Regions:
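A sequence-level/structural motif corresponding to short, flexible coil/turn segments enriched
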Residues: 1-239
Length: 239
């Protein structure tokens, strides 16, 4: 098709071990990958129309849908799941906990289904965070955002199964019972959810220009490290 998804594995010396392809006749892309303790890989991104992941075929409900897929250490497709609705929906970040559950973030527009869980945007696009078990069953889905366009870009987990998300939002956005208001344009957010999908806290950073969080990582003490970009002057707490 136009663009296809690939997943590739190299050994520690940089030798190519295998490469796998997925997709269809339209535009399809992989955005993030994570590995569990058994060497299985988990991938998320988007696809349009009909896309094949090994013997599994998915068909999007609208312009583009989210996919979450699992491969074993030899590159065999184990399962592939889709989420989304009739508009544009993208998976941007994925992380795995010690039990093999996958956590995914990105954005959706309009009404989107994550297995049995349906979410409706508050505005142009909303952030989603969703959890699947090791067999690809949807466990929960949460949304955040407001009346404008809001995006989740990266997600990480700690040893207790909490997940941490970063991205950006504009104007007022709700993260559960927590409301944030951007300084003027887009601001960075960092949020923590527990293993059941409850929002524990959300923080913002930025200034009056465009600011965004693009990647997040967690250390063994539960500290989160975030990177992205800012323009002009930006505040990060008291710094």
């Amino acid at each position: 098709g136009q663009d296809d998804i690939f997943v590739a594995k190299l050994d520690s010396s940089g030798n190519w071990l295998w490469t796998k392809q997925a997709g269809g006749t339209n535009y399809d892309g992989g955005y993030s990958i994570a590995i569990d303790s058994y060497g299985n890989s988990y991938v998320t991104g988007y696809f349009r129309g009909t896309a094949s992941f090994g013997s599994t075929t998915l068909t999007s409900s609208g312009e583009s849908d989210i996919f979450v897929a699992k491969l074993d250490s030899s590159g065999n497709w184990l399962w592939a799941k889709k989420a989304g609705g009739t508009d544009y929906d993208y998976g941007y970040g994925i992380a795995i906990d010690s039990s093999g559950n996958s956590y995914v973030t990105g954005y959706f527009q309009g009404i989107a289904s994550f297995g049995p869980y349906y979410k409706t945007t508050s505005g142009g696009s909303d952030i989603f965070v969703t959890k699947l078990d090791g067999d690809g069953n949807w466990l929960w889905a949460k949304k955040a955002g407001g009346a404008y366009y809001d995006y989740g870009y990266s997600i990480a987990t700690d040893s207790s199964g909490n997940c941490y998300v970063t991205g950006y939002f504009k104007e007022t956005a709700s993260f559960g019972d927590i409301n944030l208001t951007s300084s003027e344009s887009y601001d960075i957010f960092v949020a923590k959810l527990d293993s059941s999908g409850n929002w524990l806290w959300t923080k913002q950073a930025g200034g009056t220009n465009y600011d965004g969080g693009y990647s997040i990582a967690i250390d063994s003490y539960g500290n989160s490290y975030v990177t992205g970009y800012f323009r002009g002057t930006a505040s990060f707490g008291s710094t």
